[in-house]
UniProtKB/Swiss-Prot annotation:
Protein's UniProt name: RNA polymerase II subunit A C-terminal domain phosphatase SSU72
Gene (name only): SSU72
Organism: Yarrowia lipolytica (strain CLIB 122 / E 150) (Yeast)
UniProt keyword list: Hydrolase, mRNA processing, Nucleus, Protein phosphatase
Transmembrane segments: none
EC nos: 3.1.3.16
Reaction equation(s) it catalyzes: O-phospho-L-seryl-[protein] + H2O = L-seryl-[protein] + phosphate; O-phospho-L-threonyl-[protein] + H2O = L-threonyl-[protein] + phosphate
Coiled coil, from the record: none
Entry superkingdom: Eukaryota
Keyword field contains Plastid: no
Protein family according to the UniProt entry: Belongs to the SSU72 phosphatase family.
Upper lineage: Eukaryota, Fungi, Dikarya, Ascomycota, Saccharomycotina
Amino acid sequence: MTELKMCTVCASNQNRSMEAHKVLKEAGFDVESYGTGSAVRLPGPAYDKPNIYAFGTPYDDIYNELSAQDERLYTANGLLTMLDRNRKIKTAPERWVEHKNVFDVVFTCEERCFEAVCDDLMDRGEKLQRPVHVINVDIRDNHEDSVIGAQGILKLARSLADSKDLDAQIMGIMDSWQEQHPKLPLMHAVGYF
């Protein structure tokens, strides 16, 4: 198995990227996670009243604030369970554009995040001349789909790590994976750090 440094990315670094982060970490992968949004947005007491936090706000703080605000509501909609999972993985949501790390594979969870990562890589320039495979696995932003999507990402990550020549084999690996996961559309691009 190849030692690949991986990353998972969604908009707020809360649901999809964190479920995939958890699953990959538990499987022994070297993984980090980020969000591409301008802020962390979570459902609020009404559709037009989301809870908005700055990236870097500790998951513990968000958990405690929402629990004090309306524990019954945020338990029923799964937010407190999600935040409890997240705080066991890392301290706080992190923003993609603020990191300085280098990855072999970046998994994004929706097309706009894929585009944001690809744009950011181009803006950074190719200083290290180090390729990175950016793979979008389109996952709807709800608990059930994040669990299904994370398992799909894990299977794809294992196939990528098992390859003898990732650059030469990646298209075949993704084609085979896509046949097995037709409800999780894939996109792929090569960027550079």
